[in-house]
Amino acid sequence: MSAERKPERSFWRTIDVSLSANDLRKKTMSKGILGRKVGMTQIFEQDGRAIPVTVIEAGPCHVLQIKTVDRDGYEAMQLGFADKPRRLVGRAGRGHVASISSKRSSKLKAAGGSLGTKPECEPKRFVREFRGAATAEVGSEIKVSVLDGVKSVDVTGTSKGCGFSGWMKRHNYAGQRATHGVKKVHRHAGGTSAGTYPGRVRKGKKGAGHYGVDRVTMRNMKVVRVDTENNLLLVHGAVPGPTGGFVIIRETNKVG
């Protein structure tokens, strides 16, 4: 007689779903700020060694919105960086950062409700969220001094666009031989699939195409200097993106 088969263990039984909203709020947010890449330079240490650094204009940022578990299902703090002229922003964008009169707001006021606290600042060009329990109030200003004492950061930016590139530049392939029968196809891809089966190029095959304009994160970058007077942050090494590109800076959670 065959033994009875044990029921498979459900994956969801291993997850503790009994956490309340108060328990979730206890998760603190990692330090972070928005900025703009200024460029690269080098500084000299006391022993004479030259260190390549990237200069980032970090802040000041305004807290535009606070996301809560009760209302939004998760906790986050929305930051905005770099003012944008109001004439270039739609009514929804202007109403996100400042109180403006509308039919909806009038009805809410008549019913005794409110649209919540507004930061009362200029619209922002670069807006991003930082997950976790908020450490500031709506409308407050976040400066580069928030990174004082931080040794390493993760910098996220958008890589430079290279247009339509070949497979050698895009995927770092070696190409074909320079001599011995190779003619006019030195930088070509060569064979991409078999003829009889599968008789086609499989999906996901590396080849030529659009290269760049990707979200890239450089992790565990050493903080060389924090200039609170000029809102500048100097990190060791190169940061993804062109000069003037927006970046996200977070305190790294990588060990070692």
Q: Across the structure, where does each feature detected by a protein language model lie?
A:
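Cationic, low-complexity basic patches in intrinsically disordered or flexible, solvent-exposed regions
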Residues: 5-9, 13
